[in-house]
Amino acid sequence: SAIWFVDYAILPEFKGKGLGKIMYKEWSKICSNQMAICSVDSLRVLKKFGWEDNYAVKRLTKPINPLNFLPILKNLKLNFANKALRYFVKKKYSSTVSINFYQINDNFKILNDSFRIRKKSTNNNYATIIRDEKWLHWRLMECPYKRDIYFFEYKNNFAIVHIFFKNVKRLNILYTYSTDISYENELYCHITNWAINNDIDVLWAINRSNDLRNIFPKIFNNPLKFAAWSSDAKILKVLKNGLDIQGIDTDTDSCLYVD
């Protein structure tokens, strides 16, 4: 087990008095295994205390209609330009294969049944998060914006997504898994094709896979600053290789959401 280190700050008038070190030592007593996704400033401090960092997991973004990111052009409602952009992007991902699309609220049982028999990672080179059906229900069915959560299914591969509007129409891919052979890249391609046809402006995901470069341009990739510490040298060696997390495991998706 481990605890998630969020952050801490020292007020300006108390800086230089060693309080940060004292706070950290007290925090370390809570649990011998600690992890964090942190800012550059926090990482700089944590590394002084022996934390290891890893940048394998990336925040992935694919703009479909860049015009909607420019307020002036967005207000002009350039429908022709929008259709043209989607047409050229669609040529790369066009497919006649249908992908099943469900609203989570009315179809949770389908997702829950597949989640129960999903294939779990057998890679012992990096740490993973233990997820079960109770976690799935809590994360999705008790989510304040569950009305905006959906999932796709393709060849027994599933993708839980969050579709909402904040300045632009977004599709956040929260979590993917399979119950049989993995077709993750194909799943992402079909989701991209669906997004183009349904007026989505931007795709977003968090993933450590290097097999999605045909979908997410490298220029928009942003490595997550993962850091970890453990009093056990063997555990720290594993944590040094990073954590297998996806968008559903962070608060980034929730921070983007506006009710």
Task: Kindly label every feature range from the protein language model.
Residues 10-30, 181-194:
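Conserved acetyl-CoA-binding loop-helix of GNAT-fold acetyltransferases
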Residues 17, 108, 210-211:
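Serine-centered coil/turn micro-motif
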